[in-house]
Structures are given as structure tokens and as C-alpha cells.
Amino acid sequence: MLLTADDIRQLNDKIQYQSAFIDRLRDETARVIIGQHHMLDRLLIGLLSNGHVLLEGVPGLAKTLTIKSLSQAIHAKFSRIQFTPDLLPADVIGTMIYNQQKNEFVVRRGPIFANFILADEINRAPAKVQSALLEAMQERQVTLGDSTYKLDEPFLVLATQNPLEQEGTYPLPEAQQDRFIMKVIIDYPTKQEEQIIIRQNVQSLKSPEVSQVVSMQEITQAKDLTRQIYMDEKVENYILDIVFATRFPEKYKLEKLKPLIAYGGSPRASINLALAAKAHAFLNKRGFVIPEDVRSISKDVLRHRLGLTYEAEAENVNVENIIDDVLRVIQVP
């Protein structure tokens, strides 16, 4: 549907009003989480775009604290699943257990039945457990016995991977990684931020409490409104050019990338770039998408969707280098 300039102006005003809770949310979580603004914003983008986020970072970077604080600020149910090699699918989604008193099988729901789920070290569990979680993420429902149970909304899975430890891990296949809207690399805090973290943890035994500052209804309305954000055809073509340049680099004067890319982004990459760009616009209180929204989220959306050749590894070329080259060459509308 084509929007007039007046329609876009009205939508912009509406989003400026409806997105006011973002500032409250950031301020409240900042009382507990020092730094990590990029991670929090990416979680909010995942939440607004109805996607899930894969985080990669060493232990101790406040991944658990961030998603737990976010759930408390929204008064949502939080669940943490520690993935281990002996975990079973039933430990994640639940199972049917026999009740001797009632002489019947009853449902025991697993930790997947929550609004915010931290799937900690997802690459430590066998493939069948990963598959059970990812299927629930995709379908947003779980089948136990003969019955199907819808998962609660909002529903956000934050899966973590440790980039350092490879022994005893089951790497997520590319097809499974593709189900996450973003893969976010978590970095260390700055020296100043870490100084505040030290003081906060040394001076008090009790961590600050996060209060509810946003209602579930506001989140639901924000998700619906995010879908309505205007995206011009020029921005759509910009997204398509970025993704197509990862598939056919030679058509975009990027011949040097052809021997380095094993496979480019799938159509899901284009869809998720558009969804994440709209959510990024919402966070910036805009009713329309600009190219900078696309550029800001492109690495997080694309880094787990591109495959590199052995030649790229031999030349020390990583996915970020490829994306940088693509963004540099593709003309900004």
C-alpha cells in the first residue's frame, strides 16, 4: 500500500508517542547493567521484529543479567536453560508424566514456556535438543502427547555461544543459525564502565532491583506498529542489492570476493534485514526506514548467513570484511 506524505507524517507522530517507553526501559536497565548498550538494543530489535537473537561472547559479559533485567522491566516470565551434553528434548519443551493418583498422563511443561528464554551455551547440547528448541522457536508452539500448546507472547529466545571453547561442543548448523534474526558479537566493557562495575559489586552485596516500567500491552502494540513503519522502494532495493552482492559479487564490481564466498545470504537474509531495519527505526522514534537503519544492523543480520571458502580463511578474511566491502560498493539511495 502506497502512503502519502501526510500518512507518513501521521505515522511518524504516532511512533514518536508510542516509542516513549524505550527511554524508560533503557534508563531502568541501566541501573543494573553497565554498558552493553549494543546488546540491549539488539535484544529490543529482536523483540520488536518477532525474531530471536544469537549471542557470541566470553563468559562474564552480563548476557544473563541483561535479558533477566529486560524481562523484569516488562514484568515478563524469564527462564534460563543451561545446555549440557546430557540434556534431553523433554528437559526443554516438557513431557507427559503418569499421575498415579489420577490414573492418567498429565503435562509437565518445560522451561520453554516463558516470555524470555536464555538458552545458555546452546552449542553444548546434542543436535536433537538444539532441533527441539529451534522448532519451538520457529513454530511458536509445542506438541506434547496428542495436544499442541501455543507459547506465550511476547516470546524471545536469546541463545549464547562461547567462541573460545570448542571441545565437547556441537556447532549449530548453518540452516539452524539462519533461524536467528541476528548474531551479535559481545565485546568487553570499556575501562571506565568496568570501574563502575567493580564499585557496584564491591560496595554492596545486593544488586539494584529492576522495576516494571513497561506493560506487556505496550510491547504488543509496539510490535504491531513496527510492522507498519514505512519503507520506501529505494530502501527495499538497497537491501536487495546488499544481499544479492553476497550471492553474485561479480555483478556488483566485487570480483575479488567471488573466490572468498562459499554461499551468500538467503531470502531470509533480505526479510530479516527489512524487519530489523524497521525495528531500528522504531528505536530511533521514526515512522520510516532510512539507509542508515539498514547499514547499522547489516553485520548483525548477515554475519551468520554467509559461508566463506578455505581461500578466505587462508587469506585471513572474515565475514565482517566481506560485509564491509559490500557496504562500501553498494550505492546508498
Task: Please report, for each region that a protein language model flagged, where it lies by residue.
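Conserved AAA+/SF3 P-loop NTPase catalytic/coupling segment centered on the Walker-B
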Residues: 111-138, 152, 167-176, 188-196
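Pre-Walker A (pre-P-loop) alpha-helix and adjacent loop at the N terminus of AAA/AAA+ ATPase modules
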Residues: 15-61, 244
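P-loop (Walker A) phosphate-binding loop of NTP-binding proteins
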Residues: 58, 92, 160
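AAA+/SF3 P-loop NTPase mechanochemical coupling elements
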Residues: 106-115, 144-161, 172-182
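Conserved AAA+ ATPase core "coupling" helix
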Residues: 89, 93, 169-224, 232-242
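Short glycine-rich substrate-engagement loop in P-loop NTPases that contacts/grips substrate
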Residues: 87-116
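C-terminal engagement/docking regions of AAA+ P-loop ATPases
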Residues: 1-15, 249-333
